[in-house]
Regions:
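Glycine-rich short-loop/terminal segments
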Residues: 1-79, 124-154
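A detector of repeated loop/turn-to-beta-strand junctions in beta-rich toroidal repeat architectures
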Residues: 39, 103-105, 115
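Structural recognition of the beta-strand scaffold that forms the well-ordered cores
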Residues: 41-42, 80-84, 107-110
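Extracytoplasmic/secreted cell-surface and envelope-processing proteins
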Residues: 52, 90-94, 117-121
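Short His-Asn-centered micro-motif
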Residues: 55-56, 83-87, 100-101, 110-114
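Active-site-adjacent loop/helix micro-motif of nuclease/hydrolase catalytic cores
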Residues: 64, 89-98
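Histidine-centered catalytic micro-motifs
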Residues: 78-92
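Sequence context surrounding c-type heme c attachment/ligation sites in exported
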Residues: 105-111, 118-120
């Protein structure tokens, strides 16, 4: 697993990139279920290969976007799944929806650990669909389904 550490204006960001869907889903699920900070799980492509980025910003109220990390360590990464956790609220915030604006082809979601539900959203609606996510295997299945949908569109 390649690790990257970047700083933004308010705190340190801790993110890592891997080619292993299992490792990414396992670490993200463990972090979300066992901490009170927001986590990010992103799946996509870099240099034509499937990649997964996970991380947190050590804050309970926000997590950095990949573009918000100094020195842009994930340059060239093309996301198809962009999920982050909300420890205390369901659905996307206005800020989440603003971050989704203009990013076509990406499935955005907020995971709420209290009810183990993923809330899909876009730049217009904070709750398009709700999907139960009882384990890391559910997260992996969701991700693989989105990879397949993306491959069919190309």
């Amino acid at each position: 697993m390649e690790t990257n550490l970047g700083n933004n204006t308010s705190s340190a960001d801790y993110f890592a990139e891997t080619s292993s869907a299992y490792d990414a889903a396992n670490i993200a699920t463990f972090g979300i279920e066992n901490t009170g900070v927001e986590w990010k799980y992103t799946a996509g492509y870099r240099d034509g290969e499937k990649k997964y980025i996970i991380g947190n910003s050590s804050r309970d109220y926000s997590v950095s976007t990949l573009e918000g990390i100094n020195n842009n360590p994930f340059e060239g990464f093309q996301p198809i799944v962009d999920i982050h956790s909300h420890p205390s609220t369901q659905g996307a915030s206005e800020h989440d929806m603003l971050n989704a604006k203009g990013k076509n082809g990406v499935s955005f979601g907020v995971y709420f650990k209290d009810n183990k539900t993923l809330y899909e959203y876009n730049s217009v609606r904070s709750n398009l669909n709700s999907i139960k996510m009882n384990s890391m295997l559910d997260l992996m299945r969701y991700t693989f389904r989105k990879y397949n949908e993306n491959d069919e569109e190309e």
